[in-house]
Amino acid sequence: MKALLRALIGQGIEALRANGTLPGDTLPPDFVVERPKTREHGDFATNAAMLLAKAARSNPRALAQALLTALPDSNDVTKVEIAGPGFINFHLAPTAYQREVAHVIKQGHDYGRGLAGNGRSVGVEYVSANPTGPLHVGHGRAAAIGDSLARVLDANGWNVKREFYYNDAGVQIENLALSVQARAQGLTPDSAGWPENGYRGDYIADVANAYLTGDTVDMEGHLVTGTKDPADLESIRRFAVAYLRNEQNHDLAAFRVDFDIYFLESSLYKDGKVEEAVQKLIASGHTYEEGGALWLKSTDFGDDKDRVMRKSDGTYTYFVPDVAYHLTKWQRGYERAITELGADHHGSLTRVRAGLQAMELGIPQGWPEYVLHQMVTVMRDGEEVKLGKRAGGYVTLRDLIEETSADAVRWFLIARKPDSQLTFDIDLARAQSNDNPVFYVQYAHARVCSVLRQAQEKGYKYDQVHGLAELARLDDEHSLAVMLELSRYPEVVEIAGQTLEPYQIAQYLRELAHAFHTWYHNSKVLVDDAAERDAKLTLAVATQQVLANGLELLGVSAPEKM
């Protein structure tokens, strides 16, 4: 519908150029066509006249009137009016919305998919949990947001690569190995010889037992076997990392999250990428030495103070491999790089960008882009869920999935803006009622499937071609409300991709489900009149399709029965 209105406005602008109202060399402005906040202001509004007023040396409202007069007639537009300082509001005919139903039916799974990305490459990194323990609910929120964002970008025509960065070379891995070794030697977290910064969760005992019994872990095609030797710290380190990565991948698979690339921090050192990044920074002239340490002049690039890159003992600070890692993303040809992180990592953003800018390689400012999520509080029976002993102090993603479902967990972890704190109510997530938003939306999809089964059981032969031809019969308030919501879907997908906010898909699906349930309760679908029945079934099938398309972007199933 936006394309139709943009075409009409474009023709109106050409008419104003032809009659001299606008100078002949006036270029069409980058005007917007958007839905007003309230339906009283029409179905769509444009600011075209306000943008052209200066070129026309005219008052914006006067130019809006001229443009309104110059617009070609369209059977899909019932009224055009001027509002405010020069907005032009369009009221559409039911035929415009009825035609959108036909578009849904024709395009099917592709309805809502766009070409904004035009096949360009984008790398989306998310989760990137240290392989030192089970995934917790915060990792779950990162997984849900990141995976859905990747799906939304793919739907907008981007060539998406999903990436998981393993911090397998830091001090946390050393602490993990020491913790597993201590368990293998018979110590407990309360023992006097327990490592000072050791991990205390019961899962450490699971890793140690698997190592001592000589278990073999298949880590993405590489077999790692426990050597049973509690004194062999290096073997323990390799086995523990493989074991916990395998556990994390198991949870992610259950959560319907997968990746194209698993990138190991250790490979940055092995392949010389950290040293390469450091040498590029030195060569650019944005480093200096002081107190035996190598510093980055990060204040030249918006940081609040310069940062140490290499300490006096020769080791690198933690942000240097982060810079090196993102340099590889640039070298791998990502036009865009998006990193989803917990809000507690906010301080690293400026440093990483400063390091990349300081290399003077033509990397754009603001690259990579970041999506930050806030923490999650888990509630049951009105009280916060106590921290899990197995995980050593947090609620695991596996716990939530087992208590509710992957569908419910994904929905609730996506359904709010990432930068807002989130309360996950286990009781609500399990509820089979309209108060549960994921149930409410899935039930709308299942309800259509049920109606189609009932039609078959009653011996009604559904003729979709006939239904499309008879959509003009559906001009009542509730039918048009469903059609209006269906027409919004491509815009919502596009906006979610532009803003990197997949939660907008969830919000939209609730509104579509509400419109559908309201229509269903106020309109008998399986009526005796075949023309009316086919038209209503066609509207229901179109709704089913859009619900399925949107749920797929969230990684949530679209059940046929509930």
From Swiss-Prot:
> According to the UniProt record, what class of enzyme is this?
ligase
The species this protein was found in: Xanthomonas oryzae pv. oryzae (strain KACC10331 / KXO85)
Q: Where is this motif: 'HIGH' region?
A: 129-139
Q: Which GO terms describe its biological process?
A: arginyl-tRNA aminoacylation
What the record says about family reads: Belongs to the class-I aminoacyl-tRNA synthetase family.
- Which PANTHER family does UniProt cross-reference here? ARGININE--TRNA LIGASE, CYTOPLASMIC (PTHR11956:SF5), ARGINYL-TRNA SYNTHETASE (PTHR11956)
Predominantly, its location class is cytoplasm
E.C. designation(s): 6.1.1.19
The protein's name: Arginine--tRNA ligase
Classification of source organism: Bacteria, Pseudomonadati, Pseudomonadota, Gammaproteobacteria, Lysobacterales
The lineage's top-level taxon is Bacteria
Localization per Swiss-Prot or TrEMBL: Cytoplasm
Identify the HAMAP family for this entry.
Arg_tRNA_synth
Q: What keywords is this UniProt entry annotated with?
A: Aminoacyl-tRNA synthetase, ATP-binding, Cytoplasm, Ligase, Nucleotide-binding, Protein biosynthesis
